[in-house]
């Protein structure tokens, strides 16, 4: 199994500290309450990469079709963490997380199971997550459908803190090909699944302001999740209807260049915390509450 030096992550903004206490009280009588844990551990190597400051632009990817398909190239290995401000302006975040003892089935199950109750969502990031209901919840729970049929074309309505900013987002999960990933390359890369999406601000769901790519793949000792986030304006986002309005909408909501760079940093920290925390308990949670059909 991959050897990693994990370290406690201990700084959370005051609003997040207060949210933790509310979440702790809400989950107390749930059968899965023991998985609500205050300690969050992250790879020290990922922390150190983020501490180096914004990445050089030549080391980043844009949301263009050409660049996102680089994630599928046989010799491509993602960096563990990092963030930058791209021209546009656009916030950029990259990461690669290891889930020891986890399978693709466990990870898929999590995306079916957690939206049913807000308290389940809080297990994922107790200091940051509020709720994440699914628009088409009956389809999400329909065991006669495949995972892809249940998730793609479905929308999660996430409320969560990113840093000290409470964000209300619509996450519209899409087929990989709909986002620009090449079907042949995807198959050749032997990706076990994708939970990739377009994101919008909840009060403007018709304007995608973000492309989020999450690709997961099993390895002998667990699973790797490779992720990219792009938030903001970029010419290549024009392939998504409504994205041409993203720049003005974000500016109206207080996201200038400085704010987007801060958001990139905070998203990098958020991603590092939530997915490494999920990795710490998902196999045990699945063994207790998961079913093969889900």
From Swiss-Prot:
Q: Which UniProt keywords apply?
A: Hydrolase, Metal-binding, Zinc
Q: What is the effect of changing residue 121 to A?
A: 81-fold decrease in catalytic efficiency
Q: Name one Pfam family in it.
A: DAPG_hydrolase
Q: Which residues bind Zn(2+)?
A: 129, 160, 270, 274
**Presence of keyword Zinc:** yes
What cofactor is needed?
A: Zn(2+)
Name of the protein described by the UniProt record: 2,4-diacetylphloroglucinol hydrolase
Q: Look up and give the organism this protein is from.
A: Pseudomonas fluorescens (strain ATCC BAA-477 / NRRL B-23932 / Pf-5)
């Amino acid at each position: 199994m991959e050897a990693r030096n994990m370290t406690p992550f201990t700084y959370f903004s005051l609003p997040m500290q207060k949210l933790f206490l509310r979440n702790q009280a809400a989950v107390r009588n749930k059968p899965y309450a023991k998985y609500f844990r205050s300690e969050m551990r992250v790879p020290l190597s990922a922390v150190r990469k983020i501490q180096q400051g914004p990445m050089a632009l030549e080391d980043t990817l844009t949301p263009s079709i050409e660049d996102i398909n680089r994630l599928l190239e046989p010799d491509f290995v993602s960096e563990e963490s990092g963030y930058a401000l791209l021209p546009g302006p656009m916030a950029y975040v990259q990461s690669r997380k290891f889930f020891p003892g986890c399978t693709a089935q466990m990870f898929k199950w999590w995306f079916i199971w957690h939206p049913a109750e807000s308290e389940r969502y809080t297990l994922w990031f107790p200091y940051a997550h509020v709720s994440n209901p699914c628009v088409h919840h009956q389809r999400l729970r329909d065991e006669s459908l495949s995972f892809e049929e249940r998730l793609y074309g479905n929308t999660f309505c996430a409320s969560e803190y990113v840093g000290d900013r409470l964000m209300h987002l619509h996450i519209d999960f899409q087929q990989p090909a709909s986002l620009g990933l090449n079907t042949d390359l995807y198959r050749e890369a032997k990706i076990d699944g994708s939970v990739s999406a377009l994101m919008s601000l909840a009060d403007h769901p018709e304007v995608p302001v973000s492309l989020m790519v999450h690709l997961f793949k099993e390895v002998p000792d667990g699973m790797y999740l490779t992720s990219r986030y792009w938030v903001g304006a970029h010419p290549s986002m024009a392939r998504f209807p409504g994205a041409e309005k993203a720049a003005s909408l974000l500016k109206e909501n207080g996201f200038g260049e400085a704010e987007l760079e801060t958001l990139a940093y905070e998203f990098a920290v958020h991603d590092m915390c939530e997915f490494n925390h999920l990795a710490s308990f998902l196999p045990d949670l699945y063994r207790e509450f998961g079913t093969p059909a889900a």
